[in-house]
């Protein structure tokens, strides 16, 4: 489906000119540049129907990669093939098979009703009338579009506009959809609707989806697989569940108990579990590394040595894990 081999993108940034007439004149005839490696030797293979989270900090190379995968940018070297096509060289044919959402950038027409934008896109992508009617009904139900179809895009709230954007991106039943920060700035309810919609479209049509986001709940809800990039270089590529196991993820056990009786543990947990008391000493938070302590054994020790009123186990969030990777 998507095959990326030894992909590189180098931006040339003009060097700052030193003060002085001679330096300015020299630069006029022989401009010098610094090379900035936005993406370095990236190789990926993405199967049909996968939802892949492509994540990293600002400036890591995510958006540059997506722009090359969508045919907006031409790689400096290496190759990209999507369904056998080169996104840049075969762009006019290629774009008919993809859908794209770039954060706040709209593909809808600002001054006309949403339904008219969708009808124009229907003609652009040559969507048969029967398919258009069926998809519009499906999108209206899934994204609650009925209330906004006859409003112009400029009248819509951000959440309403993004629901319409998703309908536009999936209207022509693309084989691949690229989502670059699709839920940025949205409230919790709209995010949930959009995640649910994307999941349904993936399951119903086996659509391949590439997602970049800073909202890591999007990743946890949607993605089968995660690729982590840093300074243009791939750091991790595998199932989301492996992210938790491969790095020093922490787990927290929160217990409530009689504040007059401090928490006791067996000797085997000495120096492995950090205990912090809060809420007037009636609540204790026990933090430890997954690889050092078995949660079940710790809980057994807690129950054997203490009178516990309540107990909650919390895993590290993927955001905390990613942060720990970057500070290494």
Which residues are covered by each model-predicted region?
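ABC transporter nucleotide-binding domain
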Residues: 195-285
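Conserved ABC ATPase "signature" region
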Residues: 20-27, 119, 123, 131-148
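Catalytic Walker B motif of ABC-type/P-loop ATPase nucleotide-binding domains
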Residues: 177-181
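Conserved ABC ATPase signature
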Residues: 152-156
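Conserved catalytic motifs of ABC-family nucleotide-binding domains
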Residues: 173
């Amino acid at each position: 489906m998507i095959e990326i081999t030894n992909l590189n993108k180098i931006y040339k940034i003009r060097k700052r000119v030193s003060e002085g007439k001679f330096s300015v004149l020299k630069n006029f005839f022989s401009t010098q540049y610094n090379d900035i490696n936005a993406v370095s030797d990236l190789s990926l293979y993405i199967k049909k129907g996968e939802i892949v989270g492509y994540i990293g900090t600002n400036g890591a190379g995510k958006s540059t990669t997506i722009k090359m995968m969508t045919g907006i940018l031409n790689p400096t070297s290496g190759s990209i093939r999507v369904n056998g096509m080169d996104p840049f060289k075969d762009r006019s044919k290629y774009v008919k098979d993809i859908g794209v959402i770039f954060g706040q950038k709209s593909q809808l027409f600002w001054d006309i009703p949403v339904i008219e934008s969708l009808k124009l896109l229907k003609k652009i992508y040559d969507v048969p009338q029967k398919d258009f009617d069926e998809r519009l009904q499906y999108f209206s139900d899934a994204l609650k579009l009925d209330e906004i179809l006859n409003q112009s895009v400029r009248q819509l709230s951000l959440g309403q506009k993004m629901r319409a954007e998703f309908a536009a991106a999936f209207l022509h039943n693309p084989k691949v959809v690229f989502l670059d920060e699709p839920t940025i700035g949205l409230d919790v309810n709209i995010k949930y609707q959009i995640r649910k919609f994307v999941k349904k479209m993936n399951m119903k049509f086996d659509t391949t989806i590439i997602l970049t986001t800073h909202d890591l709940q999007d990743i946890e809800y949607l993605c089968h697989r995660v690729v982590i990039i840093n300074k243009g270089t791939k750091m991790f590529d595998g199932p989301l569940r492996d992210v938790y196991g491969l790095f020093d993820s922490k787990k927290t056990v929160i217990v409530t108990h009689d504040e007059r009786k401090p928490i006791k543990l067996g000797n085997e947990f000495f120096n492995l579990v950090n205990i912090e008391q809060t809420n007037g000493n009636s609540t204790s938070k026990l933090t430890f590394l997954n690889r050092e302590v078995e949660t079940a054994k710790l809980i057994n020790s807690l129950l054997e040595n203490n009178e516990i009123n309540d107990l909650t186990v919390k895993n590290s969030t993927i955001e905390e894990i990613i942060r720990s990777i970057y500070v290494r």
